[in-house]
Design a protein with these regions (language model features):
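A composition-driven surface/loop motif
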Residues: 1-201
Length: 201
């Protein structure tokens, strides 16, 4: 398959329900903005890709992915969220379940709290994130096998410890920190907050 939705410049989702059940890259544009609605994507490459189209090459445009609200679930065989510029998540619930064959995961430059963890997930495994009081932050049934999980919701507070449960395995993770063995800023790395350059999840 090819891309699910593609725009040269701006792709904005303000509401409704969208399900890209099969694609190469599910959502692709220079600037991808999700403000509300329910968005679920499946892709053999990047889930959401912000990149500079040849038609805009002479305009010095800056790619960006911005999620301000809604419920976003991304299943990707490469990068879940791939911005060749800024990646910002300020609201809503975003979950990325990925294989991690590309440069993932990489974290938002600014925005609300998030957790990221390397996991071993089989299709149909129950995956959930709970806080220190065992209150559920997010829960889903994985629609595909995965090796990386990223979750951002308003309930997640940076610096707090959360528990990621995938199948029968549980792991503790601190919000706002890359998983052990994850990629940080630096030459050849995929960058953390403030590192500039591209942002991959």
């Amino acid at each position: 398959g090819d891309d699910g939705l593609k725009a040269v410049k701006n792709l904005t989702i303000d509401g409704g329900t969208m399900n890209v059940s099969k694609s190469n890259e599910a959502l692709e544009a220079l600037n991808v903005s999700i403000n509300n609605g329910t968005v679920t994507t499946h892709s053999t490459d990047d889930g959401v890709n912000a990149s500079l189209d040849d038609a805009l090459a002479d305009q010095n445009a800056a790619p960006s992915i911005t999620i301000n609200g809604g419920t976003v679930k991304v299943y990707a065989d490469a990068d879940g969220l791939d911005s060749n510029g800024n990646l910002t998540i300020t609201g809503g619930s975003t979950t990325v379940v990925g294989i991690g064959s590309g440069g993932m995961p990489q974290t938002p430059t600014v925005g609300q709290g998030w957790v990221q963890q390397n996991v071993t997930v089989k299709a149909q495994d129950r995956v959930k994130v709970t806080d220190s009081n065992d209150a559920e932050v997010v829960s889903l049934t994985a629609e595909q096998a995965a090796t990386s999980l990223f979750v951002s919701t308003p309930q997640i507070m940076e610096g707090q410890t959360y528990t990621v449960t995938s199948g029968s395995a549980t792991t503790s993770v601190v919000a706002g920190e890359n998983a052990q063995g994850g990629f940080g800023p630096g030459p050849g790395g995929f960058g953390g907050p403030g590192s500039g350059g591209s942002s991959d999840l």
